[in-house]
Amino acid sequence: MTEGNQQKQFDSDSFLRHLTHQPGVYRMYDESGDVIYVGKAKDLRKRVSSYFREKVDRMKTQVLVKQIASMDVTVTNTEAEALILENSFIKKYRPRYNVLLRDDKSYPYIILTSHQHPKLGFHRGARRAKGDYFGPFPNGSAVRESLNLLQKLFPIRQCDDSYYRARTRPCLQYQLKRCLAPCVNVCTDDEYNEQVALAKQFLQGKNQQVIDELMNKMEQASTDLDFERAARFRDQIAALRKTQERNSVTGSQQELDVIGLARGNGMTTVQMLFIRDNHLQGSRSYFPKVPTDTPDDEVLRAFLLQFYLSDTAGRKIPREVVLPVDVQPDNVLAEVMSDALSQPVKLQSSVRGDKRQYQSLAQKNAVNALESRLNQQSTMNRRTQALQQVLEFGVPIQRMECFDISHTMGQQTVASCVVFDQNGPKKSDYRRYNITGITPGDDYAAMSKALAKRYDNAKEQGNIPDILFIDGGKGQLAQAENYFNDWGKEAPVLIGVAKGESRKPGLETLIMAGSHETIPLSKDASALHLIQHIRDESHRFAITGHRQKRAKVKKTSTLEQIDGVGAKRRQAILKNLGGLQEVKNASIDKLASVPGISRSLAEKIYYSFRDE
């Protein structure tokens, strides 16, 4: 099968049904598993559901939704916290549908300049100006919104230096109580720098510390009978409390991992939050296999050892790990981790302040991830049972496999084999096979070779699927039939999955081996949804492998490595186009204009140098 535009259908109804109303960040993935969009929400369910309304006005949203193959979320305590995490994810994943696909130097920042009377301002680009930078922010409007808030809270100038130098009397900002007018010496340097220091602490996330300092200053001003100054501090405190959102993401921890644990219905979720440089840099859910009735502390001890100390893990141990329960009454585990890091490592469960909020946040995400996984498992079990009934299986279906072929113009052919059981994808059993020694573009031969690679040496009956899906029509299915006719063992049930004319989900034709009769299923049948899921996963896995192989070839690709381009044609191409770089940049029409180069060969040359 040539790489096409087959797109996995995202089950938005099922996802939204169990989505929380809490604030957080959502990530959208395409069929290749790449993050294509990151967003934040005050109400996750309300925001995410807006993408799947029947009428969506924005063309960008329509295009984006068509590309969604899966989604996941990270719950946060506040919308402000979600904003910071959203920015972290955008930097990490660089999603193509987010606006900010650029380097850090192009992200906007707030700058507090190094000046006798520092100013707060908007900055983008190289950091040549001296001062303190705060950010980056996800977009310019976020910076301007923050500057507007800061101007209301701290009377610090935001004017250009040239405007500042030209003043002979206070401007309107002074009248609005948004600047102390240091330009004309209305305030002292100490008074101005006092506000600068408070603004800096606020930008560092030390909100409560700012309020505490203002309270002390207000009380001191009252004691000194400076009631006007005391009133100014009082108003400042009121404004801060009104706008304050305690954000646990910007605490004082420099390097901290926080772990949450949730268990239920035979499943365990361990949730990791990674805090670096005072920010939540990311999160991840793990679902370890845990024997029944294993105590929580034992589960966590085993997880910590495997997560941080495995020879193959390669993870950096943080200086502090916050846990939901105590795991080391004898401190042995902390000593082992400290030895590995060559610095003291704290493992603690009794925490306060920001760490307690991190701990609570990790627990929220653990519960959310567990509920989501249990829902997926329930859906998978229901669909598997439906398929079992359709195929009239007398015993439960234990294992299903699906094959797909991916290539571009017959080059870098890759076959995929994905495996599903009653709980969903079994990714540890996934396999890819590089297909060589066939006529380029011969999908039938590619399928035959892939089956031989997978099953020729399959000696353990437990690894043989109950059902084998073949992504393709009767021709591809016939290759599987021919192979298993001579196999000498009990063959799996073979089913061909042929695409409809428009390749739209729901229009597939399911073909049984032997009789080649079609299996009638409605568009909303659970069994069909399962088959689509398996087929789409096989397609995704094949395309991903093919692209990786093609990209690898591209790095070393030369005309000598392209089938059909011999010495004479190579010489003609270089003579007419001028050099290898010109060949790489040439269009198909330009390549086909070279004497001796056919249209089909021009296409082969063109695609050999491209990833898309």
UniProtKB/Swiss-Prot annotation:
Assembly with partners or alone: Interacts with UvrB in an incision complex.
Cleaved signal peptide residues: none
Domain GIY-YIG as annotated: residue spans: 21-99
GO cellular component: cytoplasm; excinuclease repair complex
GO BP: nucleotide-excision repair; SOS response
Predominant location category: cytoplasm
GO terms, molecular function: DNA binding; excinuclease ABC activity
Keywords: Cytoplasm, DNA damage, DNA excision, DNA repair, Excision nuclease, SOS response
InterPro entries: GIY-YIG_endonuc, GIY-YIG_endonuc_sf, GIY-YIG_UvrC_Cho, Hlx-hairpin-Hlx_DNA-bd_motif, RuvA_2-like, UVR_dom, UVR_dom_sf, UvrABC_protein_C
Top-level taxon of the source organism: Bacteria
Pfam families attached to this UniProt entry: GIY-YIG (PF01541), HHH_5 (PF14520), UVR (PF02151), UvrC_RNaseH (PF22920), UvrC_RNaseH_dom (PF08459)
Native source organism of the sequence: Idiomarina loihiensis (strain ATCC BAA-735 / DSM 15497 / L2-TR)
Gene3D superfamilies on file: 5' to 3' exonuclease, C-terminal subdomain (1.10.150.20), GIY-YIG endonuclease (3.40.1440.10), UVR domain (4.10.860.10), UvrC, RNAse H endonuclease domain (3.30.420.340)
Keyword Transit peptide among record annotations: no
Protein name from the UniProt record: UvrABC system protein C
